[in-house]
Design a protein with these regions (language model features):
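C-terminal and inter-domain tail/linker signature
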Residues: 1-130
């Protein structure tokens, strides 16, 4: 069983890495926070931590990432976010990471074009704080 302090540290790590990669575009964090055998389940990004600096370098000047809620259980951390400038419409995502010994070892994501609240059946936004 993963201790509550480790779960909290894992959440903080994922938040820090997402900020470094997508907000500050800082590739210097890769060796420290991504495991050498980093497994990537996004079909557009290769396995391995060496793909991260390439990803950063291909972010458009107008690209913007906004973090949302973050939840964790055991060694898994999920962070809700909005990506603007990755395509013609903003994307809302849930990024899921497996963390082992203070490093990201595996990543999955679920991405969807954002539907504005005013055009959704519920009238609720896809991306908001809890």
């Amino acid at each position: 069983m993963t201790s509550p302090s480790t779960v909290a540290a894992n959440k903080a790590l994922v938040s820090k890495v997402m900020d470094a990669v997508f907000v500050r575009r800082d590739g210097s964090i890769v060796d420290r926070y991504f495991a050498p055998g980093y497994i990537q389940h996004n079909p557009a990004i290769p396995n391995g931590r060496d793909a991260i600096p390439t990803l950063i370098s291909h972010l458009a000047p107008g690209f913007r990432y906004e973090p949302g809620m973050i939840v964790a259980e055991g060694d898994l951390v999920m962070i809700h976010g909005r990506y603007t400038g990755w395509g013609p419409k903003p994307m809302v995502a849930v990024d899921i990471f497996r963390v082992v010994d203070g490093q990201l070892v595996e990543h999955w994501d679920v991405l969807q074009e954002e539907v504005p609240a005013e055009t959704s059946a519920s009238g609720n936004p896809m991306f908001s704080s809890p």
